[in-house]
Amino acid sequence: MGNTCVGPSISKNGFFQSVSTVLWKARQDGDDALPGANGAPDGGGQGRLPAPPPPTSDAPLAVQNKPPEHVKIVSTTDTASAEQDASKSSAGSDSGEAARPRPRVPPVKRVSSAGLLVGSVLKRKTESLKDKYSLGRKLGQGQFGTTYLCVERATGKEFACKSILKRKLVTDDDVEDVRREIQIMYHLAGHPNVISIRGAYEDAVAVHLVMELCAGGELFDRIVQKGHYTERKAAELARVIVGVVEVCHSMGVMHRDLKPENFLFADQTEEAALKTIDFGLSIFFRPGQVFTDVVGSPYYVAPEVLKKKYGQEADVWSAGVIIYILLCGVPPFWAENEQGIFEEVLHGRLDFQSEPWPSISEGAKDLVRRMLVRDPKKRLTAHEVLRHPWVQVGGLAPDKPLDSAVLSRMKQFSAMNKLKKMALRVIAENLSEDEIAGLKEMFKMIDTDNSGQITFEELKVGLKKVGANLQESEIYALMQAADVDNSGTIDYGEFIAATLHMNKIEREDHLFAAFQYFDKDGSGYITADELQLACEEFGLGDVQLEEMIREVDEDNDGRIDYNEFVAMMQKPTMGLPAKKSGGLQNSFSIGFREALRMS
């Protein structure tokens, strides 16, 4: 199962300025009373939760790392409940984005047997996974499952195993999505640039997909690592990417989530094949069939998808965006938040004037223009793209190096600044009871099953209670922004971090306490080793530590001091030049507070 049309890595810290003053004003008018812990309106009918008293300077920083009045739900597993994130996994799944938005007709139909009966998802009895494979270390984590290294007992050969917890498959659609993903992987099996599936297994706890192990790293990482990059190489990669799209379309499959994170190299060798992974959002289609559900990832989503009327042409648009990035290092349509990105996708102009475009061949620019035509009827098909002179073997793509700035931009674009989100989580977990009393009540109000985890459905209902009229894709984006560990749910600590008022984040004692959390040895600096340890504690594996440090390290000494740390917390989204001014107001927590109609 894949990502929804939600937060890109570099825009997660700036979100939804559009749901702001209007929502708060409506709350002031008292139209929607916010329920308290027992479901009744709080605050004497004013519709507000009790405001936390102002913090005192000597307030203890008691760690709040458990949900309030946590009631453990009986579960058949302690296995992690998130699907593989492509940027961290060697077999690949999506980048840590939330479950895909698709319209639901209330009430939601529950699949009561999915987490209890063997064969309830695959509809057949399978061999035991553990009889054939031994599971090793975790490779990656996403919304619905976790990917592990697994070794075939009979041969000792290594594979990747994506385990999807059945208790996460809440609706009939969720179950059908898993079945379809498996069917599509088998349907496309044998293509050299599509990840191969070894087998599917099911037990009472999870569905397990054993697939080819892709240990060669992500597309952009390999390019940056090599350091030498030419337009001809970009054309070669474009040929592979569009070739996969053509094969999918010829076999009646639309991928619907093409992005660089979903392309991994099979191994570390120079001649390693580039593989397409993660078919969680893919779907079978017939010629002329029209789809309406909004899925994908913001930078790569086609305009007709946002308009909820699209076909297979949307994949060509996504491939065109990837080629644009391969040539210049940044996406063609971007903004500081998801809403802005969607506006740019719908109405923005392609930039061929900024560097390095003046030095890029006219053939490359012609191809990109024709792939990024907003009218899908006028857009090139995948087959037509492969016939374009710039893409063809021995074609027009020159063998001259691209500007070195392309590599640095690409590296910035592909690396998430996870440090800031981890720091916000640390601050949230070190607030006193008084400081978060109101937020605790709000968490209890939304977490209706007292599981200690807010699901998408619970968040949707909670937002409706407070009068926030958001689209499903917007709610998924809020989930994405708050879900630091990519588990597909928002736990107590993540919720507090996402709803903190800026005056708490700016307090010196909170910033210093967060800095000390990362500065394990008390040296006054956060080193790469300390950052690696923190990432492991947060369940974030295979992150680009050097790039995370480089984004913050102003004096280029390879480590982060306290002043640099504070500056990071006060800056808007990193990675691309800011299109809008702003400081802490651009934090991802603002979008959550506004949606919940908080001050």
UniProtKB/Swiss-Prot annotation:
Residues 133-391 form the Protein kinase domain. Expressed in roots. A lipid is attached at G2 (N-myristoyl glycine). This is Calcium-dependent protein kinase 10. Keywords: ATP-binding, Calcium, Kinase, Lipoprotein, Membrane, Metal-binding, Myristate, Nucleotide-binding, Repeat, Serine/threonine-protein kinase, Transferase. It is found in: Membrane. Ca(2+) 3 binds at D519, D521, S523, Y525, E530. GO terms for biological process: intracellular signal transduction. The gene is CPK10. The keyword Kinase applies. The keyword Ligase does not apply. Ca(2+) 1 binds at D447, D449, S451, Q453, E458. May play a role in signal transduction pathways that involve calcium as a second messenger. The lineage of its organism: Eukaryota, Viridiplantae, Streptophyta, Embryophyta, Tracheophyta.
